[in-house]
Amino acid sequence: MPTSVHFSSAIVLGAGSWGTALAALLAERGLSVQFWGRDEELMRDIQSHRRNERYLPSLILQEGVEATHRIEKLRPADLVLFVVPSKGIRTVAQQLSAAQVLKGSELLVSCTKGIELETGERMTEVIGDCLPDHGLAALSGPNHAEEIAQKQPAAAVVACADSSHARLVQDCFTLPWFRCYTTDDVIGVEWAGALKNVYAISAGIARGMKLGDNAIAALVTRALAEMARFGTSMGGRAETFSGLSGVGDLVTTCYSEHSRNNRVGKLLGQGMPLAEIVSSTRMIAEGVPNTESLYRCARKAGVRTPLLDEVYAILYEDKPAKLAMRDLLSRDPRPEAD
C-alpha cells in the first residue's frame, strides 16, 4: 500500500448512499473532504450527527468530512467527485462553475453511471462541457455503498486518458479493504456502467416473474454480449467489458438485493406499474432514465440491442413482461458469437 497520498483534499458532490460512502473512503485515506448536498436539512443533520440517516445510516462519518448545502461556500480542492443522478450532473456542474470555486487544476471524477438523455453524452463529457480545461476521469465497478460502509472487500476501476492522473485517483482509493485499478478506456468504462443498469432491470423482471436460474443466467450472459457489442460500437475496447466496470458490475447488479435497478425490475415483473414504483421508491434507479437514453443512442447508431429494446418497451410502452420474454425467445436463431 502506498505510504503517501498525493492529493490532500476533495469535494464530494452528492449526498446519496454512494456519495456518503465515497466521502468516508477518502476521509479514511487521510484527505480532508467537503461533502455537498442540495438538501439543507439533510446536510445540517449530517454535519451535526456525523451520519446520513436518510441514505446510509449504518456509516459514521469521520471528523474530516465537512457537510454543507451551500455550493458557493466550497473551497478549492485537489479532487472533485460528481456523485449525483445522471439527470442532475449538468446542473450541478453549471452551479459549480458559476460559483467560481475551482482553480483549474482540480481533477474531476464522475462516479455516476449514465448517459444524458438530451445529448447522448457520457458523464465526463457533460462535466467537461461545463468545466473545461480540467482533467477528467470516471470511477466505476461493482460497488454497493452498503457493503463499502461495512468495510467489506471491494474493487473498482478509475478510467482516465492521463495515466498519471489515474494513478493519483487510484492512490486516494487504495485501502486495506478497497482496491482500485486503472485504465485509459474512459469510453468503455462509462458505456459499461450505463448499460449494466438496464440489464439489471431485466434480471429483476425475470425474478419478479419467478423465472429460474437458467433463465437469469441466460439473460445475464446475453446482456454481457450486448453490452460489449454496443460499447465497442461507441468506441470502447472489448476487454473493458470483461473487467470490473463490465462483467463485474453487471453480475453484482443483476444478482444483489442491494441493487436498486434489480429491485425496480422485480416489482415490474410482479406487475407493479412503473409510476407506482417510482413514486414509492426513495432511491434513484438510474436504469429507468438510462434505458430511454441508451435506446435513443442505439437507434441512432444502428446497433442491435434486443434486450435493451424489450426493457424499453416494458418501461415506456407498457408492454407486458411475459410478452417481452416471449418475443425475446421467439427471435430468429443466431450464432452465439453474433
Where are the language model's segments positioned?
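General beta-strand structural signal in soluble alpha/beta enzymes
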Residues: 110, 135-140, 180-184, 242-243, ...
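NAD(P)-dependent Rossmann-like dehydrogenase/reductase catalytic/cofactor-binding core
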Residues: 196, 203-207, 232-242, 246, ...
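NAD(P)+-binding Rossmann beta1-loop-alpha1 motif at the extreme N-terminus of oxidoreductases
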Residues: 1-59, 68-69
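Rossmann-like NAD(P)(H) cofactor-binding subdomain of soluble oxidoreductases
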Residues: 61, 67-153, 169
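Internal alpha-helical scaffold of NAD(P)-dependent oxidoreductase catalytic cores
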Residues: 100, 126-134, 153-201, 205-240
